[in-house]
């Protein structure tokens, strides 16, 4: 059985749980500029953390709000430009007006472009390359609204417009990471589980206390809530999660980090792997035969554990790994450092691989409405 996290919106479309969040500050998103931020700074819009409310807090400009809020009486509309933390194909947006009740904007729209030259705000605001990917849409009072994006292209920046003014707590963009693999040095080890490279947690036995995707986020965890933690297991068995690697790779080194988990870390862990060629139905990976690559190994609290000489059966490429923890507990980060299989045509095929990732990913017919 797979248990739901209490912090996840049960009404959210499936791209929220099945895709990477490309925009937040946690993955490197940056607000480059905006038309106005009188009441609350635009950087709040891409905070990884959920918005909070403080009824008693006021600042020099007025009521403190955990979001982006502009002045009243704009004769036109406000907008901001944000650089995605991870370039990719966007499948949907989440616009959250939490705690903005009488001051939310009635409508919003979004445009996007792709520019890897790292342009500045002034260049971007004058650009003619913006493409509408979300038409002007209705927002609501203190609620989350979800909007599907049907433009199957790689983007690096978005322009978020609100009409005419007001406050939005958070903006999320969910999609598929598209990485340029030609930039990888031959022989270099790459963390193929990392979200910034295109790794994704696909299945989990339980993530009651922490979002499952925390485990593949950049950097070390900042606190216990910034990891993956399961409930106390009262019956037999153990907890686990599966990660779809960014691409097939030969596992060379593994890191399991229990940072901040001191009285609630797993006593041990093991890791299995599988290649999708032997498991055609990725939605039922648990039903297929997995290869053990890390035998059951003891863990300690609040520590980084590195495994290299302990690895077994790791002489061939895999596409998915499964982290088993015994019996339950918390892990903050998982790193699966791999070498890429040798291929004479590897560089020539990279563009084709990226195109395939774009066209075959998360089809509209597979999305929840």
From Swiss-Prot:
* Secretion signal, residue range per the UniProt entry: none
What reaction is this protein's catalytic activity?
Answer: allantoate + H2O = (S)-ureidoglycolate + urea
Q: Where is the composition biased (Low complexity)?
A: 345-357
Write out the ranges of the annotated region (Disordered): 341-369
Cystine pairs = none
Q: According to the UniProt entry, what is the EC number of this protein?
A: 3.5.3.4
GO biological process assignments: aggregation involved in sorocarp development; allantoin catabolic process; asexual reproduction; gene expression; purine nucleobase metabolic process
Biological role:
Utilization of purines as secondary nitrogen sources, when primary sources are limiting.
By sequence similarity, the record places it as follows: Belongs to the allantoicase family.
Query: What is the protein name stated in its UniProt record?
Result: Allantoicase
State the species of origin: Dictyostelium discoideum
Specify the taxonomic lineage: Eukaryota, Amoebozoa, Evosea, Eumycetozoa, Dictyostelia
């Amino acid at each position: 059985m797979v248990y739901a996290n209490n912090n996840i919106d049960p009404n959210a479309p499936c791209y929220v749980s099945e895709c990477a969040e490309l925009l937040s500050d946690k993955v490197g998103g940056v607000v480059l500029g905006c038309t106005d931020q009188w009441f609350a700074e635009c950087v709040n819009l891409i905070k990884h953390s959920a918005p909070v409310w403080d009824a008693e807090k006021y600042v020099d400009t007025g009521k403190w709000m955990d979001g982006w809020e502009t002045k009243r009486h704009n004769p036109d509309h406000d907008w901001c430009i944000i650089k995605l933390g991870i370039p990719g194909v966007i499948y949907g947006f989440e616009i959250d007006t939490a705690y903005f009740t009488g001051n939310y904007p009635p409508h919003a729209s979004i445009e996007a472009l792709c520019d890897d030259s790292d342009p500045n705000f002034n260049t971007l605001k004058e650009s003619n390359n913006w493409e509408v990917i979300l038409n002007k849409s209705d927002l609501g009072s203190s609620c989350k609204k979800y909007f599907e994006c049907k433009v199957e292209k790689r983007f690096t920046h978005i322009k978020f417009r609100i009409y005419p003014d007001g406050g939005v707590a958070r903006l999320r963009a969910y999609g598929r990471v598209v990485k340029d693999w030609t930039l990888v040095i031959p022989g270099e080890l790459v963390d193929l589980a990392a979200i910034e490279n295109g790794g994704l947690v696909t299945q989990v036995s339980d993530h009651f206390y922490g979002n499952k995707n925390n485990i593949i986020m950049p950097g070390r965890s900042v606190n216990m809530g910034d990891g993956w933690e399961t409930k106390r297991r009262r019956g037999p068995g153990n907890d686990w999660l599966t990660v779809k690697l960014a691409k097939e790779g030969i596992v060379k080194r593994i890191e399991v980090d229990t940072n901040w988990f001191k009285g609630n870390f797993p006593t041990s862990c093991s890791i299995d792997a599988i290649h999708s060629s032997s498991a055609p139905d990725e939605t039922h990976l648990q039903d297929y035969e997995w290869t053990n690559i890390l035998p059951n190994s003891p863990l300690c609290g609040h520590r980084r554990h590195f495994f290299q000489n302990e690895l077994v059966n790791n002489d061939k490429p895999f596409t998915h790994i499964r982290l088993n923890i015994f019996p339950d507990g918390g892990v903050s980060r998982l790193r699966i450092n791999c070498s890429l299989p040798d291929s004479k045509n590897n560089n020539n095929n990279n563009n084709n691989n990226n195109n395939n990732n774009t066209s075959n990913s998360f089809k509209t017919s597979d999305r929840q409405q």
